[in-house]
């Protein structure tokens, strides 16, 4: 039976440590980390994510604000809002909730955020720093996965890691973080031929393809470590990941559950990066 990698418990532990660090920062430097979340439109899934981020920020002791903007806002108006918070010393982290409406150029908006306040790690300057081995702000899901692997003492050096999914949010930055740990990395996607055969060679398999229960036991080798990034609904409407958990858990050594695996760590890393941005602000 596989060890269940409990991301929720790890997140709670890290959040408690963060509360202590924030309290010390307030006492010593009179600084409260500040996070502003900018939400355009009324996407129901985005609203849930934003509420979760708000709760986590308040729990950590941050100064937190959500800016709700009309879906009809122009690109220029949105950039003006971002620029306002770029200049506001009360806020150390700026998060623009994605996706944005179709009439807004996402890359232009990501470029508008001050890289020092880009706690999502999506600004090209931060992605460039990651690729050059000098990461500061890293996309939160891959950062959270690395914390889970560290917590469970998963050896990466010399190991074969396979990632299903090539997004800028998970797949690509995940590959770079694993390379930094001297893993041999294969980045795959839905059009990779003989995908199950490729995945079956992995010591560490990270799945972020967005298809419910896509990965079955034929994809995994005996004793592998499996990280499931997906969050979907199965035919019965129950939350599930991209991995068929019940099938795969009998074959692997460790696996993250859905829910309670990667998800809680994503928000925790967002809070941690906001705290780190506040620390860096002391240096100017």
Swiss-Prot record:
InterPro entries recorded: Aminoacid_DH-like_N_sf, NAD(P)-bd_dom_sf, THF_DH/CycHdrlase, THF_DH/CycHdrlase_cat_dom, THF_DH/CycHdrlase_CS, THF_DH/CycHdrlase_NAD-bd_dom
Binding site for NADP(+): 165-167, 190, 231
SUPFAM superfamilies for the chain: Aminoacid dehydrogenase-like, N-terminal domain, NAD(P)-binding Rossmann-fold domains
Pathway as given in its UniProt record: One-carbon metabolism; tetrahydrofolate interconversion
GO MF annotation terms: methenyltetrahydrofolate cyclohydrolase activity; methylenetetrahydrofolate dehydrogenase (NADP+) activity
Keywords: Amino-acid biosynthesis, Histidine biosynthesis, Hydrolase, Methionine biosynthesis, Multifunctional enzyme, NADP, One-carbon metabolism, Oxidoreductase, Purine biosynthesis
Pfam family, one: THF_DHG_CYH
Reactions listed under catalytic activity: (6R)-5,10-methylene-5,6,7,8-tetrahydrofolate + NADP(+) = (6R)-5,10-methenyltetrahydrofolate + NADPH; (6R)-5,10-methenyltetrahydrofolate + H2O = (6R)-10-formyltetrahydrofolate + H(+)
Keyword Oxidoreductase: yes
GO process terms (BP): L-histidine biosynthetic process; methionine biosynthetic process; purine nucleotide biosynthetic process; tetrahydrofolate interconversion
EC number(s) from the headed UniProt entry: 1.5.1.5, 3.5.4.9
Matching CDD domains: NAD_bind_m-THF_DH_Cyclohyd (cd01080)
One cellular component term from this protein's GO annotations in UniProt: cytosol
Similarity comment text for this entry: Belongs to the tetrahydrofolate dehydrogenase/cyclohydrolase family.
NCBIfam families reported in the protein's UniProt record: PRK10792.1, PRK14179.1, PRK14186.1
Role, per record: Catalyzes the oxidation of 5,10-methylenetetrahydrofolate to 5,10-methenyltetrahydrofolate and then the hydrolysis of 5,10-methenyltetrahydrofolate to 10-formyltetrahydrofolate.
Subunit-structure text: Homodimer.
Protein name listed in UniProt: Bifunctional protein FolD
